[in-house]
Amino acid sequence: MRNLLLSLAASMAIAAPALAGEARLEARGGVYWEPGNTQATAGAAAGYDADLGTGAFLGGEVSADKVLEANRRTAFGVTGRLGLKPSADSKLFAAGGYTTKNCALCEDAIHAGGGYEQGFGSRLYGKVEYRRYFTKNNAPDGNAVMAGLGLKF
């Protein structure tokens, strides 16, 4: 899995100069919950969004997130984003991807969700996002709501 994530990140870095868009780095935190358990979460993400005309974009990101609870480990993810740009400084998007398991007895997951990103000047942005984690083998599905603060390049 680590090789897949590194390959995707390298591909995004190589393709970035040929695309019209922006790279981004963010720190984020929020709440993760599953039946009977709610915990804080913190993480970081790096991504690239390419413009699809003036009103839409397509992007991808790699991420590392940690549920702040004993016996949890960092979950790594790869996510695609597709969205609209309601204004020059805002993005409304749907997202989906894959996340590694966040504990020894947990399951990896496919995730789907959506969010809103708002620019504050030319480089700073804030973001809120919801994700649903669909697990397998009858493991409980998880949910997360996160807020992030990042820089655009």
Segments predicted by a language model, with ranges:
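Cleavable N-terminal export/targeting peptides
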Residues: M1-R24
